[in-house]
Amino acid sequence: MKNKSVFIVSTEFLPGPGGIGSHAYQLAKELHKLGWQVTVFSEQGHCPDSEIEEFNRNSVFKVVRLQPTPSMALLLLKLIKLVWAAIIQRPGVIIGTGKHGAWFAVLTGKLTFTKTALIGHGTEFIVTMSKRSHKINNKVFTSANALIHVSAYTQQIAESIGVVNNNTHVIHNGGDDELFYPLPVQAVERFKQEKGLAGQKVILTAGNVQPRKGHEFVIRAMPQILKQIPNAHYYCVGPPTIKTYLEGVADEVGVKSAVHFTGRVLKDELLLWVNACDIFVLTSVATEYGDVEGFGIVIIEAALCKKPAVVTSESGPGEAIIEGITGLGIKEKDVAGITEKITTLLSNDLQRIEMGENAYRNAKANLTWSKVVKKYDAILTSLIK
């Protein structure tokens, strides 16, 4: 009988923010539905302990919260905890997601003779890491029994720095159609009234407000957007990591009254924000430290709410749209291109609505987690034969 027990070792996990944590949660939830016995090991932060405890208590699979490890002694204790759990529970496969999640997964797998599957999101292959970290990282990812990239873009980055695994796959991220779906018009209009959005053309970016998301370039495009669409407003939903800097940019270009930061919102409110927007935007960039956007789950979540997207076409998000059908692509840091694509969609209701409908149909047909997980299931099952 096959051992359908799996550990997922992640660098982050819900209920806190972060694409890797969201991906790990969805993978765990969907594998559980397919009959896998799932245990998640991860740090959990950026939200109150009470919220984390309630989340873990209500989870349908087991979540083991790991504490931050600022010292070598604590790192060793974390490894011992994982190895001991693997010895006791004997999982068939250990999945590692995020750089340190991957490192711990492979170490635990080697010490307990357990198969490993790693997931590459993009941040694991930052080219500016130290030579020592680079060497360890390459060895970890090439030695796994399977390597799954969330985009062809991520695979390209990995292979450009020497990370080549003989059992490599590309599986695009999925969206959760139980959490993201079109809401009734009345509910959306009521939310718009409550938030002061009535009469506005709403441009939305959701996720951690950090450099790689490219908020700055949308803000720099706003002066020209406002000349053509005077009622356009840009909303940045998510933890406001670089809010002060971006407010300075908005002030510099004279659009401070049209740029808004909501801070972190809970999932029910996020659903309302996505439904309330006219277009979703993710103009991500590769930062000076090599941080990149591997795919962009939020684009699929927006599509599940019938929203077209404007994204950077030369990175992972470019693989989350069908150009001209479900969204529009721009070059990295192309303020003129951002202006053109956003104004095109905001000024043409029929085109925008049609693209949103196309995005919805494509996401429902190909990119919900219930469909994506079958590809993971096939790979994991092949490892435990």
Description of each model-found segment:
Residues 299-311, 321:
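Short hydrophobic beta-strand element within catalytic cores of glycosyltransferases
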Residues 246-269:
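Nucleotide-activated donor-binding/catalytic signature segment of Leloir-type glycosyltransferases, i.e.
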Residues 313, 322-324, 328-335, 344-350:
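Conserved acidic donor-binding segment of nucleotide-sugar-dependent glycosyltransferases
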Residues 96-102:
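Short His-centered aromatic/hydrophobic patch
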Residues 258, 275-290, 307:
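Acidic donor-binding loop of glycosyltransferase active sites
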Residues 9, 197-213, 219-222:
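Conserved donor-binding/catalytic core segment of Leloir-type glycosyltransferases
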Residues 52-54, 182-196:
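A short helix/loop element that forms part of the nucleotide-sugar donor recognition site in Leloir-type
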Residues 153, 174:
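Carbohydrate-associated surface elements
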